[in-house]
């Protein structure tokens, strides 16, 4: 039996089948974010404090409370500010992962491509264009996290950071729209076609 969130995702046009939830990912760690820092992030990025929760010592990013999704500080610093734009929502749905599972460098690259396409073509890039311009990969240290890099010989944006230290333990929960995967996912079969 599917949850209400999974039923809504399945009905979204162009979405892939619901992916399998991850059990005990190796990246599971409690947050080190403090309430004072969370309040500062809310003010800095225009996030309503009523929409966020600071996880407790026994809470983890891969299993947020119902109606919430885990967000890390570096995502906001990269320009991916909740509730996200439609472009990011569709990319995450197509990849069948939760927002936290996309490495913060991926948000910097994707948001950079959004700005570039908007300014030059007056539109957002399609998923197919993103797959042509970027490579998606996982590494052995963090197999639940998806890395994004500019494809070799097709980098439109240069000198973006390739790493973001400490993002796994600086997260909070934010109320999420129904079309997000909240729990961490393995990813659908189509997802792995784009991985190197």
Per-segment meaning from a language model:
Residues 1-196:
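Residue-register detector that marks a fixed positional context within folded domains
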């Amino acid at each position: 039996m599917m949850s209400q969130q999974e039923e809504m995702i399945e009905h979204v046009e162009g979405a892939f089948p619901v992916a399998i939830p991850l059990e005990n990912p190796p990246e599971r760690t409690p947050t080190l974010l403090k309430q004072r820092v969370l309040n500062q992030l809310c003010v800095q990025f225009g996030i309503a404090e009523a929409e966020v929760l600071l996880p407790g010592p026994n809470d983890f990013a891969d299993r947020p409370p119902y109606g919430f999704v885990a967000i890390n500080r570096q995502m906001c610093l990269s320009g991916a500010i909740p509730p996200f734009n439609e472009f990011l929502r569709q990319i995450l749905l197509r990849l069948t992962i939760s927002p936290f599972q996309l490495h913060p460098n991926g948000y910097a690259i994707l948001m950079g491509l959004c700005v570039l396409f908007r300014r030059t073509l007056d539109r957002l890039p399609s998923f197919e264009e993103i797959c042509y311009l970027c490579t998606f990969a996982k590494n052995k240290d963090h197999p639940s996290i998806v890395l994004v890099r500019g494809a070799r010989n097709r980098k439109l944006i240069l000198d973006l950071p390739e790493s973001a230290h400490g993002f796994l333990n600086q997260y909070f929960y934010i109320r999420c729209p129904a079309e997000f995967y909240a729990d961490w996912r393995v990813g659908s079969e189509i997802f792995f076609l784009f991985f190197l």
